[in-house]
Amino acid sequence: MRANNQIHNALYLAFARQQWAELRKSVPLTLSESDLDDLRGINESISLDEVTDIYLPLSRLLNLIVGAKQQRGLVLNQFLGRVPPKRPYIISIAGSVAVGKSTTARILQALLRQWPEHPKVDLVTTDGFLYPLSELKRRGLLQRKGFPESYDMKLLVEFISKIKAGESLVHAPIYSHISYDRVADTQQAIEQPDILIIEGLNVLQTGQDTHVAIQQPFVSDFVDFSIYVDAEEPLLKEWYISRFLKFRTGAFSDPNSYFHHYSELTDDEATKIAANIWDSINGPNLNLNILPTRDRAHLILRKGTDHMMHQVLMRK
């Protein structure tokens, strides 16, 4: 633990919640409670105070960083005497299952759109790049879903490299949490946004995390700014179980849901199954593949109880 703290002290500036909140300066709050309702995850009680204290300072920081990158591009264009295609600024958001990555991504998207310098902000989740269910079954990876090998990395890297190259239209596959599979014949169109947010479990992964002898590009090679949403594992497991119980009476009750058979479970049965899924799949994936990438992030958002951020770590 001491060695880990020393590494963090060397790499990061640490801000307590109130210290970070003061960095908001005069950035206005443009979201209402109604807006926030649309952005919340199923198991999160995020408040406007959380947006004000954590996300507004972060949107201000990102606006400044994106502006600096845009200015650098203008200087290079002047030096080279040419105008290259528009290239989006790419932000990645990583973290465990149930930590709230998707909510963080949606809130940041909503806030970053308010800045006149970059009004077009798109969001893509890596869930769509999981192999189709039939392929996962064929490869014997159904119980490894979410692990790095369950993703079509070739397709994902092709997608993000086209985005980075400034292609005018790029398509991303869409994932359904109802069917637990890619949506056939439906794709998300990405048309040269100012900023692209890509959210997923393993977006901080590099070649150092694989046993492949041949070097190959990873999502992290194309990312301009990376965020890791962090929490202690006991909290993550608790949040996962709570989310599972809510899905049981919500999404799982849909007859078309892949997990419809869970909808008839008692509370005790559902809790035991969710705990087992965590212990056998999500927990090992966190400790083997996700958590080891945390200290590569430019920014770490640390959560405590009730999904409240209590510390922000920013790379020096």
UniProtKB/Swiss-Prot annotation:
Keywords: ATP-binding, Coenzyme A biosynthesis, Cytoplasm, Kinase, Nucleotide-binding, Transferase. It is found in: Cytoplasm. One of its GO terms (biological process) is coenzyme A biosynthetic process. The keyword Kinase applies. The keyword Chaperone does not apply. NCBIfam families: panK_bact (TIGR00554). HAMAP family: Pantothen_kinase_1. This is Pantothenate kinase. It comes from Shewanella loihica (strain ATCC BAA-1088 / PV-4). The lineage of its organism: Bacteria, Pseudomonadati, Pseudomonadota, Gammaproteobacteria, Alteromonadales.
